[in-house]
Design a protein with these regions (language model features):
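Internal, charge-rich low-complexity segments
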Residues: 154-185
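Conserved ABC ATPase signature
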Residues: 143, 162, 169-174, 190-243, ...
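Phosphate-binding glycine-rich loops of NTP-binding sites
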Residues: 77-111
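Loop/turn-to-beta-strand initiation segments
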Residues: 244-246, 275-280
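Phosphate-binding P-loop
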Residues: 68-77, 240-242
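C-terminal lobe/lid and adjacent interdomain/linker elements of RecA-like ASCE P-loop ATPase modules
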Residues: 259-278, 285-329
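Flexible phosphate/Mg2+-sensing switch loops adjacent to catalytic phosphate-binding sites
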Residues: 101-137
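N-terminal pre-Walker A segment at the start of P-loop NTPase domains
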Residues: 25-70
Length: 329
């Protein structure tokens, strides 16, 4: 716990980035978002089917997902959470908001032929109108998915594995050069960069005046510092989340133990309160749903509605489970 708290603390200092003066009140950049209602979707299909045959499609996604939930207009707080079970539309809603607002993202997602027709029917209302402020906001805002975190974990592991392999080969070559010096380059062509590189590498490999560690760092590089998967995941979030941004997080609890979920939830609360960040999150974790100031949409409800975190069915299920096993604690 101590190590990861220190990691978050270091990350939240934002290195050498210059911080502007932050406000003492929460920032709500995205005030509301509209997705097409049932009547709007019906109007689209009437107009579209007039000139097109729809019998070749068995899905009109993302159409026909949210009208049954009675969800059309949403308003946001500094932290807004979409809660619901698998297939409730949490990730779909985040993808729609991200694409319509043009927020930066790394991971791709599957689109159907109807995405380009659905997006013009969606709209968002921002609380800032100055173009410079809007550019600043969009320059730091991000959509972060659980796939992004997993990809980062794998990238770090692959990078370190590659460096370890190169280091092993380099040391084997050095050992061979020392045992059999004649295997090194016999001459150097000063007009050939590759010849110069090979001669310099050979010279460094047999030169004992330079320490092994210095030579290896110069020629191979250094491994990225490794943490546990949970520590690496939470550090990824703290590195990506900067002051003054709108951040959309898709199930950030993935890859995190309960302990690290609590740490990340506290970090998000702090960024919203003190560093002018706004968050829109999909989650079914009690540690995120219980964050202070969070506005929660229950997408499993009919119609979808705002609820207290203790009213979410999954939270009631967890409570009943622990009450049932209370004597075992």
């Amino acid at each position: 716990m101590q190590n990861i708290n220190r990691t978050i603390g270091q990350a939240s200092s934002f290195g050498n980035k210059k911080l502007r003066a932050y406000t003492n009140f929460v920032m709500i950049y995205l005030k509301s978002f509209h997705i097409p209602s049932e009547s709007e979707e019906n109007g689209f299909f009437i107009d579209y089917s007039g000139n097109n045959k729809l019998t070749c499609y068995n899905s009109f996604y993302p159409f026909q997902v949210f009208p049954a939930k009675g969800l059309s207009d949403m308003t946001f707080s500094e932290i807004t959470i979409f809660a619901g079970g698998n297939g409730s539309g949490k990730s779909t809603l985040l993808n729609i908001i991200t694409e319509r607002l043009g927020i930066s993202r790394t991971s791709l997602y599957n689109k159907t032929d109807f995405h380009s027709m659905y997006m013009p029917l969606c709209s968002g209302e921002f609380g800032i109108y100055d173009r410079t402020q809007m550019r600043e906001l969009m320059s730091v805002s991000k959509f972060i998915t659980s796939d992004d975190v997993l990809s980062h974990l794998l990238d770090v592991r692959e990078k370190n594995d590659n460096l370890d392999f190169k280091r092993k080969i380099w040391l084997e070559n050095r050992r061979e050069y020392i045992i059999n010096p004649g295997q090194g380059p016999r001459e150097i062509d000063m007009d050939d960069p590759e010849s110069i590189r090979k001669y310099r590498e050979f010279n460094e490999q047999i030169n004992t005046s330079r320490s092994f560690s210095q030579t290896l760092r110069r020629n191979i590089g250094t491994n990225e510092r490794t943490f546990s998967n949970g520590e690496t995941a939470i550090k990824y979030f703290s590195d990506k989340i900067e002051p003054g941004g709108l951040y959309i997080l898709d199930e950030p609890e993935n890859s995190l133990s309960s302990e690290y979920q609590i740490d990340l939830a506290k970090f998000i609360e702090s960024m919203a309160r003190f560093y002018d960040c706004q968050f829109i999150i999909s989650s079914h974790s009690p540690f995120f749903l219980s964050m202070k100031g969070a506005k929660i949409y229950d997408l499993d409800a009919q119609p979808a509605s705002v609820k207290k975190w203790t009213e979410i069915p999954n939270m009631k299920l967890l409570k009943d489970f622990f009450v049932e096993h209370n004597d075992e604690f």
